[in-house]
Amino acid sequence: MRVDLFDFDLPDERIALRPAEPRDSARLLVVDPNAEMVLSDRQIRDLSSYLRPGDAIVFNDTKVIPAQLEGIRHREGAPGQQVSATLHMRAAPDRWKAFAKPGKRIKIGDRIQFGHGENVCALGALDAVVEEKGEGGEITLRFDLSGPALDEAIAAVGHIPLPPYIAAKRPEDERDRADYQTIYAREEGAVAAPTAGLHFTPSLFATLDAMGVERHFVTLHVGAGTFLPVKADDTEDHKMHFEIGHVDAATAEKLNAVKARGGRIVCVGTTSLRLLESAAAEDGTIKPWSGATGIFITPGYRFKTVDLLMTNFHLPRSTLFMLVSAFAGLDTMRAAYTHAIETGYRFYSYGDGSLLHRKD
């Protein structure tokens, strides 16, 4: 499909720079392409009105790490150069794939010293060697540290990698360490938050528990590739970056039981949906799954297992807007986004949410 079909104009003032407080006071646009009244304006705390006892909500419990690293590149016979690296996928206990700037000037064999000056951690400077170099500024870093020691050093010297559309307007600060994390995050490894989950509060969880809605957790470590623009003119030519995740056997069994007795699967976030669709067989059965997924969902895709999707408002021409258009219909989502822009919904990671019903 032509990528320009997924383009739209978004006024700059619609980009949220801070989350709503409290989290569940954010607005919720309910989109049901199968109903007479397709669009309904609500709040996140009204979510329970659209769920039934026996439904299951699936959350991504990945935890954001401070994956934005600043350092100095060292090369024999050349002056040191400032380098920025955003870690996006762990390749081994001592290796990370990263997007580097300025990427063109980095060579295989370069040594980069992260955490210098005031940012040196208790373990000393964090050193890495460029082991591989790919396209678009992607590199593979082999660190001198490994495993938990490397994790500790990254946590000490790294910064929260705010989405570019927020970082362009203000610097990351201490509030973001809490704001850019879900209340249920537990599996460290993401470099971007599964942002639909940012809306949930203990109070909302209690409401859902009381009405008999099940809660289940899967893990997909969101990579920095989620922020990359689609540069191709046709979706067939776009290359997705891979992300690591898993669905354990117990969760798969429980979700299959929900479907068998007539309950619905409600995914919180596109990451949860992409992971479940990666783990689902053609008949909709969810299998235990572990590995890297590069699933790219566009209109025409046949969804196997997910019935409803809660998600934030996405970038024009993004793979995520393509996904929601596949789920609820392109014309429906274009109309929904036009309504959201005209009525003041807040967009992107810290913005408002939507609840999408899958198009019949």
Swiss-Prot record:
Q: Which family does it belong to?
A: Belongs to the QueA family.
The species this protein belongs to is: Rhizobium rhizogenes (strain K84 / ATCC BAA-868) (Agrobacterium radiobacter)
According to its UniProt record, where is this protein located?
Cytoplasm
GO CC entries: cytoplasm
* Name of the top EC class for this enzyme: transferase
Please state the protein's primary subcellular location: cytoplasm
Q: In which pathway does it act?
A: tRNA modification; tRNA-queuosine biosynthesis
Quote the catalytic activity from the record: 7-aminomethyl-7-carbaguanosine(34) in tRNA + S-adenosyl-L-methionine = epoxyqueuosine(34) in tRNA + adenine + L-methionine + 2 H(+)
Matching entries from InterPro entries are given as: QueA, QueA_dom1, QueA_dom2, QueA_sf
PANTHER family on file: S-ADENOSYLMETHIONINE:TRNA RIBOSYLTRANSFERASE-ISOMERASE
As recorded in UniProt, its EC number(s) are 2.4.99.17
UniProt lists the gene as queA
Domain of life from the UniProt record: Bacteria
Outline the subunit composition.
Answer: Monomer.
Q: What's the name of the protein? A: S-adenosylmethionine:tRNA ribosyltransferase-isomerase
Look up the record and give one Gene Ontology term from the biological process aspect.
tRNA wobble guanine modification
Q: Which UniProt keywords are given for this protein, alphabetically ordered?
A: Cytoplasm, Queuosine biosynthesis, S-adenosyl-L-methionine, Transferase
Q: What's an example of a GO molecular-function annotation for this chain?
A: S-adenosylmethionine:tRNA ribosyltransferase-isomerase activity
Query: Which SUPFAM superfamilies does the UniProt entry name for this protein?
Result: QueA-like
Q: What does this protein do?
A: Transfers and isomerizes the ribose moiety from AdoMet to the 7-aminomethyl group of 7-deazaguanine (preQ1-tRNA) to give epoxyqueuosine (oQ-tRNA).
Q: Which Pfam families match?
A: Queuosine_synth
